[in-house]
Amino acid sequence: MSEYKQCIVTREDLKLSKGKFAVQVAHAAISASEWASKNDLEKWKEGGQKKIVLKVPTLNDLYELKEKARREGLPTALIQDAGLTEIPPGTVTVLGIGPAKEELIDKVTRNLKLV
C-alpha cells in the first residue's frame, strides 16, 4: 500500500519572521490540497496528513520545481503574499506539492533539504 504526503517548499532568499513563515506554509498546505484528486486527498487524510517542509535557494528554483511537479501530474499551489506586512505585494513565497503518493513527490523533491 502506498503512503501519501505533501511537501511545502520555501525560499531561502526570503527572510520572513517565524509567524509570516508559518502562515505562508499553511496557505500552501491548504491550497495545494484543494487541487488533489479526491482519492489522494482521502488516502492522505487516512494516513495522518504527512507534511514535509523543504527549501530551495531562489524563486527561480521554486518555479523549476513547480514545472517538474506539473510534468509528474502532481497538484501544486504557488503562494503569493498580499504584501500587507513584511514583503511587497505579489511576492511568491512558497510552493505546495501534493498530497499525492510519496514516491511521485519524491521524484521531484528528493534532493531538497529540510527547513
Swiss-Prot record:
Annotated Gene Ontology cellular component terms: cytosol
UniProt-listed NCBIfam families: arch_pth2, PRK04322.1
The keyword Hydrolase is annotated on this UniProt entry: yes
Keywords linked to the UniProt accession: Cytoplasm, Hydrolase
GO biological process: translation
Keyword Hydrolase belongs to the record: yes
Domain of life (superkingdom): Archaea
Family to which the UniProt record says this protein belongs: Belongs to the PTH2 family.
Localisation per UniProt entry: Cytoplasm
Xref: CDD domains: PTH2 (cd02430)
Species annotation: Methanosarcina barkeri (strain Fusaro / DSM 804)
Protein function: The natural substrate for this enzyme may be peptidyl-tRNAs which drop off the ribosome during protein synthesis.
Gene Ontology terms, MF aspect: peptidyl-tRNA hydrolase activity
EC number: 3.1.1.29
Protein name: Peptidyl-tRNA hydrolase
PANTHER family linked: PEPTIDYL-TRNA HYDROLASE 2, PEPTIDYL-TRNA HYDROLASE 2, MITOCHONDRIAL
Top-level enzyme category: hydrolase
Transmembrane residue ranges: none
InterPro entries recorded: Pep_tRNA_hydro_II_dom_sf, Pept_tRNA_hydro_arch, PTH2
